[in-house]
Regions:
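Conserved nucleotide-cofactor-binding alpha/beta core module
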Residues: 105-107
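As written
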Residues: 116-117
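Active-site pocket-lining/capping segments in soluble small-molecule metabolic enzymes
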Residues: 1-103, 121-285
């Protein structure tokens, strides 16, 4: 269904592969090659966003060699070993540094630019005010997640399998949306699932910024996380943001945004502002 997104005017995509840490879909090298050939007008990033063990390094190097033969625009990474491999090979990928929670200040990102990082994803766990401040002070392209479930935690351990063995309970631990966990005396539930990479925990609610384009339009990339979405929901959400961006460019966004929000609410998915308007508190001792 990539055609659906391209026809909306969306031109940048993240493709997950066998070396990605979590994903709604995993694409083979042949799949990635075919996609790049079918949509030469688009930019494709490949997510190599795990923290890799030493025994993975040689095969990872070989995989990056294969990516260099394709029309891949960039690599999304978390492990600096990936950046070092690319630098040693002198490949020309855009190297987007995207740890889940670490990109929280401009100074660090400007230093990392000197080390070969060429773009970055801003952490979701800081207020919008701070995200905007970083965008103003960083001298590289930045990506901001604007919609979808939010990463909470992950482990390379098979935590659900271990719990299953200890408890004797039977449940589908591999379904991305079937299991939820909720701490005692807490109002917040989270999705949890397990795959061959480990255990993953994500928010039950979906972050949304459809009505905040006046504030976030200066970011270079606005990212929609489609993990745990049906194909229909993913297309509908992407269409709403695509239409909203066109409306913004045509100077009709302020008039149209209420209609877009009504359509978003009709999807009947749980929505949240995440940390966008939560103030950061510093305790000084």
């Amino acid at each position: 269904r990539l055609y659906d997104y391209v026809s909306m005017g969306i031109d940048t995509f993240i493709l997950e592969c066998e070396y990605s840490f979590y994903a709604p879909y995993y694409y083979s090298l042949e799949d990635i090659k075919t996609i790049c050939q079918q949509y030469p007008q688009c930019h494709f990033y490949v997510a190599l966003n795990a923290l890799y063990d030493e025994h993975d390094i040689e095969t990872l190097k070989n995989y990056i060699d294969e990516l260099s033969k394709l029309s891949i625009y960039g690599i999304i990474f978390e492990d600096f070993g990936v950046l070092q491999i690319v630098k040693d090979k002198q490949y020309s990928f855009d190297m987007m540094y995207a740890p889940e929670t670490l990109n929280t200040n401009a100074m660090t990102l400007n230093v990392l630019k000197e080390q070969g990082v060429t773009s970055a994803q801003i952490a979701r766990v800081i207020p919008l005010e701070e995200q905007l401040l970083i965008q103003q002070q960083v001298n590289m392209p930045l990506m901001l997640q604007v919609h979808g479930v939010e990463y909470i935690a992950a482990s390379k351990r098979a935590l659900l399998s271990n719990y299953q063995k200890a408890s004797g309970l039977e449940f589908d631990k591999e379904s991305q949306t079937r299991l939820t966990i909720q701490a005692r005396n807490s109002d917040y539930a989270f999705h949890i699932y397990e795959d061959q990479k480990g255990t993953h925990i994500f928010s039950f609610t979906r972050l949304y910024m459809l009505d905040l384009l006046n504030q976030i339009h200066h970011f270079d990339y606005l990212y929609i996380e489609t993990l745990m979405m049906s194909e229909e929901e993913a297309v509908e959400v992407a269409s709403l943001y695509s239409d909203a961006l066109k409306s913004f460019e045509n100077h009709t966004y302020d008039r149209d945004v209420k209609a877009y929000m009504r359509l978003l609410y009709q999807l009947k998915t749980p929505l949240t502002r995440g940390f966008l308007f939560v103030q950061t508190v510093y305790k000084l001792e």
